[in-house]
Regions:
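Conserved short loop/turn motifs at secondary-structure junctions
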Residues: 1, 34-37, 201-202
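Single conserved hydrophobic/aromatic residue that forms the stacking wall/gate
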Residues: 1-10
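Nucleotide-activated donor-binding/catalytic signature segment of Leloir-type glycosyltransferases, i.e.
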Residues: 9, 13-40
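Conserved helix-loop functional segments at active or binding sites
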Residues: 18-22, 52, 59
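Short, flexible loop segments at the rims of nucleotide/cofactor-binding pockets, characterized by
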Residues: 31-33, 55-58
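Short acidic loop-to-helix transition motifs that present clustered carboxylates
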Residues: 37-41, 60-63
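Short acidic alpha-helix that forms the nucleotide-activated donor recognition element
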Residues: 41-49
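Catalytic binding pocket for nucleotide-activated donors in carbohydrate/polymer assembly enzymes
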Residues: 48-50, 56-197, 201
Length: 202
């Protein structure tokens, strides 16, 4: 059910946080925090503190909201798909001041209408993606190796009318990882990053 799926989606970041935050080799360098009760009072802190605004819904799937604009107005460049209000943000600040990745809306709709997308091809040819998915079921994030099995299966196996990887997560994964590298390189350029932040605020 959707409620069951949402519960799993809550459990996964909590489990990832537990692993990452207890890894002494990266202590003090990175920390994963999962905010369970996202509300306006929490959002105000996040908008002001963020260096990057990640808006990563699958193109054509997200209603246009205002959260990404609030990040933008606080100087956080957008890392995201061309979906929802991200389209307007890129039009305003320019593609060079955002970090866009993933399938376009037209590509997503074409796959949905005409087929041709098989996440297993990606799984079988991209070792990094395969490793990430295997971590869902090999005990990396939970001693219960079945806890995230349904999530793993949903990405690779069609079940009844539920198409495998219906949100094209594996299709966007490599592009997302590359976008993260672009963010890292841009952030190291302090003046360039400050310019991006100011243009987003303006």
């Amino acid at each position: 059910t959707d409620i069951f799926t949402l519960t799993l989606h809550d459990a996964l970041p909590i489990s990832v946080a537990d692993v990452v935050n207890n890894d002494t080799s990266i202590n003090g360098k990175i920390k994963v925090v999962f905010i369970e009760n996202y509300r306006v009072s929490n959002a105000e802190w996040i908008f002001a503190a963020a260096d990057v605004s990640e808006q990563i819904s699958t193109a054509s799937k997200e209603a246009s909201g205002t959260g990404n604009m609030k990040f933008m107005l606080n100087g956080a460049p957008t890392l995201g798909t061309m979906d929802g209000a991200n389209v307007e943000i890129v039009e305003e600040v320019g593609a060079e001041n955002a970090f866009i990745f993933g399938l376009s809306s037209d590509e997503v709709i074409n796959y949905e209408n005409n087929g041709g997308y098989d996440p297993n091809v990606i799984y079988n040819t991209d070792e990094e993606i395969r490793q990430v998915l295997m971590q869902l079921i090999n005990g990396t994030f939970s001693n219960d190796t079945e806890l995230f099995r349904d999530l793993y299966d949903s990405l690779l196996n069609t079940k009844n009318t539920d198409r495998a990887d219906r949100y094209f997560i594996l299709a966007d994964f490599r592009s997302y990882a590359d976008a993260q590298k672009r963010v890292e390189a841009a952030y190291r350029d302090e003046k360039g990053w400050a310019k991006k932040a100011l243009l987003n605020t303006a």
